[in-house]
């Protein structure tokens, strides 16, 4: 019983230490600073895609891929005679 109590108290101490380390560290009176993303330029959506581009994409979707043999399987394994 004492072992369980010791283990639970140790886990509580570890949890409190983790929470304390995760908290932001500021000096007394110091204001937190936040990153402002005002320097990033806005990029508009690319509208230069054409019907030909869509046709190429559609054609590529019907092509077979991932047809290599699975090295984890043995031929004939799992088949019943």
From Swiss-Prot:
Keywords from the UniProt entry: Blood coagulation cascade inhibiting toxin, Glycoprotein, Hemostasis impairing toxin, Secreted, Signal, Toxin
Residues annotated as glycosylated: 45
Main location: secreted
Any one Gene Ontology cellular component term annotated for this protein: extracellular region
Region of interest (Blocks active site cleft of host thrombin in a reverse direction compared to substrates), ranges: 70-73
GO MF terms, alphabetically ordered: toxin activity
Quaternary data: Interacts with human F2 (thrombin); the interaction results in thrombin inhibition.
Native source species: Anopheles darlingi (Mosquito)
InterPro entries assigned to the protein according to its UniProt record, in alphabetical order: Thrombin_inhibitor_anophelin (IPR018932)
Record flagged with keyword Flavoprotein: no
Protein name: Salivary thrombin inhibitor anophelin
Signal peptide residue numbers: 1-22
